[in-house]
Amino acid sequence: MGTPESSREPCPDRILDDVGGAFAMGAVGGSAYHLIRGIYNSPGGARLSGGVQALRMSGPRSGGSFSVWGGLYSTFDCALVYARQKEDPWNSILSGAATGGFLSLRQGLGASARSALVGGVLLAMIEGVGIMLNKVQSTAHNEQFMEDHAATSLPYGMGQISGQSVPVPETSSSSSGSVSWFGSLFKKKKETEDHHSESRTHILESFDAPPVPTYEFK
């Protein structure tokens, strides 16, 4: 079964990929958040300008914070991949915990431990949801494949459920009615023409042909 790690970039390129994706996500999400917050906190008559100013001041900073987090996370992830020589959800969980703890070292060991716990739990939830979604998708795909294979391998009609009729292609009643009406009309016209031709032939055959004159003198 495929895991979310199997679809990611290789380790040297993974760091740059995650840094760029995290910066874009932080810039877009942070800009929207700070714009709404600036509009809400600004006085009446200057809400839009206050929101735009808050966006310009704090939007790029949010993107930078997210990019730093993404870069550290990918660095720890690649280090664990090379150390353990395999990729599994434990790499992501341990990388999230290490990233959270490393970013909070300036606040003390207690804050660093709490941040590491939060990061590990958050990544564990994300990995669990990803594994569940992959499992559900693979199960549905396998069931659909088995149904299609069974339907194609059975003879015609044996794959039908008891009491279920074999689907018959539907035809339009109006088109069939018009076709039958035109068909009956042309059939009647053809029968009438055939009747007239037969009567004409019968009349012509009823007259005997005149004898051919001979010019022999007796």
Swiss-Prot record:
Subunit and interaction comment: Component of the TIM17:23 complex at least composed of TIM23, TIM17 and TIM50. The complex interacts with the TIM44 component of the PAM complex.
Tissue: Expressed in flowers, leaves and cotyledons, and at very low levels in roots.
Keyword entries, A-Z: Membrane, Mitochondrion, Mitochondrion inner membrane, Transmembrane, Transmembrane helix
Keyword Magnesium on entry: no
Sequence intervals crossing the membrane: 19-36, 66-82, 89-105, 116-133
Membrane topology: Multi-pass membrane protein
Organism lineage: Eukaryota, Viridiplantae, Streptophyta, Embryophyta, Tracheophyta
Superkingdom field: Eukaryota
Gene: TIM17-1
Localization of this protein: Mitochondrion inner membrane
Keyword Repeat annotated: no
GO cellular component, one term: TIM23 mitochondrial import inner membrane translocase complex
Family annotation (Pfam families): Tim17
Assigned protein family: Belongs to the Tim17/Tim22/Tim23 family.
Name under which the protein is recorded: Mitochondrial import inner membrane translocase subunit TIM17-1
Inducing factors: Up-regulated after antimycin A or rotenone treatments.
Species the sequence originates in: Arabidopsis thaliana (Mouse-ear cress)
